[in-house]
């Protein structure tokens, strides 16, 4: 599976309280969550994000409270994948479980800028920076995780099994 999109870049330790603030956790409506995604760190995110865009961040993305709402809000906002140097483990698991592709690749994060255009191949882990004509090698998903992503998350995977 390949995705192509424009980059929104963030720093270290972007926590789940910033991704979707606790004041919005009283809803499970995905569109409502998406409308507040990243608003405490990037007020214009929801106005500028387009389907297929990509979040790139430094280390420890998704740290903080364990809430499935965070990857749901990101995915519902139209983000096709998140690339970071490292992820908080619970965010990593929650993302895979809801079908949000995420890749760790420190080299890519160091070289990608806000607004760059990327193409990502999840089967190989290759990240192409089309703006800079560069390529980085991320870690490809193991086959079973790729199947979960391909089925839009763990529930879809089990339903289709």
Curated annotation (Swiss-Prot):
This is 3-isopropylmalate dehydratase small subunit. SUPFAM superfamilies: LeuD/IlvD-like. Pathway: Amino-acid biosynthesis; L-leucine biosynthesis; L-leucine from 3-methyl-2-oxobutanoate: step 2/4. It catalyses: (2R,3S)-3-isopropylmalate = (2S)-2-isopropylmalate. Keywords: Amino-acid biosynthesis, Branched-chain amino acid biosynthesis, Leucine biosynthesis, Lyase. It comes from the Bacteria. PANTHER family: 3-ISOPROPYLMALATE DEHYDRATASE SMALL SUBUNIT 1 (PTHR43345:SF2), 3-ISOPROPYLMALATE DEHYDRATASE SMALL SUBUNIT 2-RELATED-RELATED (PTHR43345). Transmembrane segments: none annotated. Its EC number is 4.2.1.33.
């Amino acid at each position: 599976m390949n995705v192509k999109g424009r980059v929104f870049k963030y720093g270290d330790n972007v926590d789940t309280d910033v991704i979707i603030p606790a004041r919005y956790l009283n809803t499970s409506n995905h569109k409502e969550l998406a409308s507040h995604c990243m608003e405490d760190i990037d007020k214009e995110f929801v106005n500028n994000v387009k389907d297929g865009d990509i979040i790139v961040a430094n280390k420890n993305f998704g740290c903080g409270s364990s809430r499935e709402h965070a990857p749901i809000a990101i995915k519902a906002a139209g983000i096709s994948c998140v690339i970071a140097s490292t992820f908080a483990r619970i965010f990593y698991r929650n993302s895979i479980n809801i079908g949000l592709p995420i890749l760790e690749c420190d080299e890519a994060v160091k070289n990608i800028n806000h607004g760059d255009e990327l193409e990502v191949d999840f089967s190989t882990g290759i990240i192409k920076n089309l703006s800079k004509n560069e390529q980085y090698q991320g870690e490809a998903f193991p086959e079973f995780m790729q199947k979960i992503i391909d089925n839009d998350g763990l529930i879809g995977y089990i339903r289709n099994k």
